[in-house]
Amino acid sequence: MAALFEENDSYSDSENEEDFSGFLSEIEENENEDEFENDDEFEDDDELENVDELEDDELSSEEVDIPSENEVIVELHDGQAEVEESLLDALLGKALAGDQMNSRIEGLFEDLDSSVEPDIIDRSELEDVDSGISVGAVSSSSAETQASDAKCKNKDAFDMSSLKKYMQYITEEEHAVSVEDIPDFASKKNVYGTSFNVRNGIMSRPPRFEFARHDQRWIDSCVSMAYEKDKTLKELITLGKLTTTVKAGAKIEFRTKFTDVHIRSADEINLMETHDIQQIIRDALNSKRLAVVLFGIGKDGKVTGCHMGPGQQDNLRLALDTAVQTEFAPPIENILDVVDMNFVPVEEMDETFLIVIRVKQLRNQVYRLESSV
């Protein structure tokens, strides 16, 4: 049995015994290298400690002690709590916590660093009278405070007294203006008429009117602008419009090449209709010639004039506008460029004029009157 165990013993010494000395030597060499590296790290730590000691002499804002296991405790002079940081964070924090390398720029961010608290505008100062008109969604008080703080940073940018007057002026209600206080130049607009009950005839809604008026401050400003510069009487006369006049009994001669002249007496204008004026304008436009119609010249060619007051002049202007704007096919465009009317005063005769109607523009268009078709 002993021989059997001896034969099958795998741990027994054999002739081919392996040599492990080489492996042991390599392990010892690695351990020696680790020892040298640890020595280098200790030397580096000693150098860092020396550098920190030099920096502690120069920097007085904070103190940094470097304990073992790469962790430090930073103790600040301003009374903050102790915070554990890594070595890298501690070094960066120490370098950045010292005095600034560049001096502070004067005047930069002074509005943000100001210790003066900005004034808050009271809403009651802006709106003394409630207009009843909503200006938008309701915002929170904090948002209004922030907006007012942003607007009031530069207090000298506007005058509160003028702003208050302006807001008070624009918030006036229409019904606050009485009819007796409205000046003569006020304009009146009927918003809606009177409403009656269809069965009993009782008035259910009175008429409503809106009045527009000029503010006295605006009138005063216009007056000051008008009289800002004084002008002499001669300068004012030169600014006036010179009106051409004609003498009664003067004989008018016509020498026109491209203009047709139509003479009518004062009696004929009383019998003339708009259709007669339309025919003269149509013939002039279709013949590509200018035309002039004179009212107030007798058969002998002398000026007699037509007696017309202001109301009669307006009626004649209305008749001419009606004649040009109707019946023409196609319609005449830019009427004021085609036809005009002038009243030439007759000297030494009151409200007596030589009436001149002119077709002063040619059109590349053939016109017809719808009533003559």
Swiss-Prot record:
Cellular component, GO, one term: endoribonuclease complex
Function summary: Component of the trimeric PUCH (precursor of 21U RNA 5'-end cleavage holoenzyme) complex, that acts as an endoribonuclease processing the 5'-end of precursor Piwi-interacting RNAs (piRNAs). The PUCH complex consists of tofu-1, tofu-2 and either slfl-3 or slfl-4, with tofu-2 exhibiting endoribonuclease activity. PUCH-mediated processing strictly requires a 7-methyl-G cap (m7 G-cap) and an uracil at position three (U3). PUCH also exhibits a strict bias for piRNA precursors with an A or G at position 1.
Domain comment, as recorded: In mammalian Schlafen proteins, two SLFN-folds come together to form the nuclease domain. In tofu-1 and tofu-2, only one SLFN-like fold can be identified, suggesting that the two proteins may interact via their SLFN-like folds to form a functional nuclease.
Tissue: Expressed in the germline.
Cytoplasm listed as a keyword: yes
Name of the protein described by the UniProt record: Schlafen-like protein 1
Protein localization: Cytoplasm
Region (Disordered): 1-67
Any Gene Ontology biological process: primary piRNA processing
Keywords for this protein: Cytoplasm
Subunit structure: Component of the trimeric PUCH (precursor of 21U RNA 5'-end cleavage holoenzyme) complex; consisting of tofu-1, tofu-2 and either slfl-3 or slfl-4; which is required for processing of piRNA precursors. Within the complex, interacts (via N-terminus) with tofu-2 (via N-terminus); the interaction stabilizes tofu-2 and may form a functional nuclease. Within the complex, required for the interaction of tofu-2 (via N-terminus) with slfl-3 (via N-terminus).
Similarity comment text for this entry: Belongs to the Schlafen family.
Keyword Transmembrane helix: no
Region (SLFN-like fold): 247-373
